[in-house]
């Protein structure tokens, strides 16, 4: 469901990027120093970091599958309130994993496409399914009836994605670009409330995208500290600033206010915090630079 959108609040990512950055992949998200390729003959060994990231995503998708199977049972049992409460929590695993999960476009369409994006691409609502199809029924029709077949299909589609992920080669470029793409997700859809248009549970997705980007940063942290300790300190501060803001909107240790309950001042503060985080995050590409001789 992540169609090309006007990249709100991320122009700064272009300004801090290096002129030697490669052209953006896929749907035209921010081109930054994070996407610079490493010369084959002078490549920094990041094999442990890439292996650890793949393991992290595989664990997230395992959790997604298990939780979605339980969600499907709630829907079949007609437990509307429980299903509504579980829905945004389940989705967080997918949102954290998007740098890899979204690279399989066919699976992303089946699992996570919004109605607006599906209709724009296919000119019809017929065939639309996945999390957001179920979301629409739960919140617009206020029932679990009609969700059962979509739930079964969703479980099968996640199983298919799980199998695909085992085949992917994770590169430093995928991780670096993925961290920026996760912030673009926040800037283009979470900030505007477009992601969870029926349930208004966008803050869960917002947090998960930030967590996904932060995981990439944490995996690179040891080597990044050797390159630029000041950059690491800045990233720590900016991640904390975003997370502290999100904490203000939590109603308990897991759940968040509806996005529609936030004021314009609230969303402005979140947008500014994401923009400030994007500046140093886009500089993580220095980790791929060989040490000076």
Model-derived features with residue positions:
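Positively charged n-region of N-terminal signal peptides that target proteins for export
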Residues: 1-4
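Bacterial lipoprotein signal-peptidase II cleavage site
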Residues: 6, 16-34
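Hydrophobic alpha-helical segments and their boundary regions
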Residues: 6-8, 67
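Residue-level signal for mature regions of secreted extracellular proteins and peptides
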Residues: 11-12
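Mature extracytoplasmic or organellar-lumen-exposed domains after removal of signal/transit peptides
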Residues: 33-293
């Amino acid at each position: 469901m992540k169609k090309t959108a006007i990249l709100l609040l991320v122009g700064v990512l272009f300004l801090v990027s290096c002129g030697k950055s490669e052209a953006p992949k896929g749907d035209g998200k921010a081109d930054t120093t994070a996407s610079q390729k490493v010369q084959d003959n002078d490549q920094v060994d990041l094999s442990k970091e890439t292996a650890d990231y793949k393991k992290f995503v595989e664990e997230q998708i395992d959790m997604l599958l298990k939780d979605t199977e339980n969600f499907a049972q709630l829907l079949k049992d007609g437990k509307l309130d429980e299903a509504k409460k579980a829905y945004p929590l389940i989705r967080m695993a997918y949102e954290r994993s998007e740098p890899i999960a979204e690279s399989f476009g066919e699976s992303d369409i089946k699992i996570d496409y919004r109605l607006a994006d599906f209709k724009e691409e296919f000119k019809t609502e017929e065939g639309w399914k996945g999390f957001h199809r179920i979301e629409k029924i739960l919140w617009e029709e206020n029932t679990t009836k009609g969700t059962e077949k979509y739930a079964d299909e969703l479980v099968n589609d996640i199983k298919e994605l799980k199998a695909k992920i085992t085949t992917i080669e994770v590169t430093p470029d995928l991780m670096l670009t993925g961290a920026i793409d996760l912030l673009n997700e926040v800037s283009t859809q979470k900030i505007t409330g477009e992601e969870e248009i029926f349930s208004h549970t966008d803050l869960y997705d917002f947090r998960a995208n930030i967590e996904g980007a932060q995981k990439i940063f944490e995996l690179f942290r040891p080597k990044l500290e050797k390159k630029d300790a000041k950059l690491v300190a800045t990233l720590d501060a900016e991640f904390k600033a975003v997370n502290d803001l999100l904490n203000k909107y939590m109603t308990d240790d897991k759940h968040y206010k509806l996005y529609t309950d936030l004021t314009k001042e609230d969303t402005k503060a979140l947008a500014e915090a994401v923009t400030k985080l994007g500046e140093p995050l886009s500089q993580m590409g220095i980790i791929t630079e060989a040490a000076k001789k």
